[in-house]
């Protein structure tokens, strides 16, 4: 799903499953966010996060993913299941300014996994082509995502 057109199609398809016929405010918000995602080359990173969450879910690994730096208020992230915050349910919050400004930088991600499932999670991260570095045993915290090239992000855990 790393190609932007495929990514965009997936976002709209999933949004239609959630909202039905897309209200103008939802379509406008998705358009704005997708423009920023494309402009700032965030397609691969977000597609990787979708794959990670899907892989964890398919293996029955409960995870709690926290996004910071504005990505946590993204409708795209919500629609794709990366974030649980739906900005459309909170119209009183002006979240667009965070999205516009922060899509220029990679999000800070914290992924908490039970200690006894770390080996399984490491295998999933390896299968996704992510380099895993851990100083000590404990919950996984993705502290930093480093953009390497058009096809890869390194996650520092």
Question: Which functions belong to the PLM regions below?
Answer:
Residues 1-157:
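Alpha-helical scaffold/interaction cores of sigma-54-like transcription cofactors
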């Amino acid at each position: 799903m790393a190609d932007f057109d495929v990514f965009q199609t997936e976002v709209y398809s999933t949004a239609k499953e959630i909202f039905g016929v897309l209200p103008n405010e939802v379509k406008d918000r998705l358009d704005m966010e997708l423009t920023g995602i494309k402009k700032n080359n965030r397609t691969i990173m977000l597609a990787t996060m979708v794959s990670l969450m899907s892989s964890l879910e398919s293996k029955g690994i409960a995870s709690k993913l926290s996004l910071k730096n504005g990505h946590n208020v993204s409708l795209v992230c919500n629609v794709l299941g990366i974030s649980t915050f739906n900005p459309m349910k909170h119209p009183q919050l002006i979240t667009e300014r965070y999205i516009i400004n922060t899509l220029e930088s990679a999000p800070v991600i914290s992924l908490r996994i039970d200690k006894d499932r770390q080996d399984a999670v490491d295998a999933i991260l390896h299968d996704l082509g992510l380099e895993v570095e851990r100083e000590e045993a404990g919950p996984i915290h993705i502290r930093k995502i480093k953009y390497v090239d058009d096809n890869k992000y390194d996650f520092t855990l």
